[in-house]
Amino acid sequence: VRAATVVLATGAVETPRILFNSADDKDPNGLGNHHDQLGRGLQDNPKVVLSTSLYKLWGSRLDYDIGYGDLLILMSREKLPDGSEFPFIGHAIHGIPDYPHYLGQMALIPPAIKEKLARHLFYSYVTLGLFCAGERLSENRVKPGHSHDRYGVRQVDIDFSTTQNTHEQMDAMMRWGTRVLKKA
């Protein structure tokens, strides 16, 4: 198979950048952009992440296999202030922190006690990552920029805003996650 043109798709920002910079006499707006739709409708999924130490697991000395694929998948629905519902999904991760960063925030606790406390809390962490469908807004877009990278290739600018509905969805997922963690 031979192709006259090959386009490497690399993601939501780099793909439009490649295509915008492919402009020539035949395609003045870049390959695949005859109708000026390239880069429009950029969206992201509203998401929240909650993490805590579960009191019930303090002091546990279980030997966890923290391999990949051990996530608990979560699905639920929540209500928005206008009474409408939206679905969301996520995952619960019961993992061990790579480094107990929380110890740095415990300035008032003596070092000898910090170490014992860290051992006590080590296996008790859980994280919830929740997300829902994003909204496609035409004005959210990747567009040709005015600056160039070190190779002289034109960069892109990104126009992105979120709606009140998106913020309400994130607030609702945060409330749901907080309720779940308080009951755990």
Residue ranges and their predicted role:
Residues 53-61, 68-184:
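FAD-dependent oxidoreductase catalytic-site/capping-region signature
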Residues 1-65:
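Glycine-rich loop(s) and the adjacent beta-strand/alpha-helix scaffold that form part
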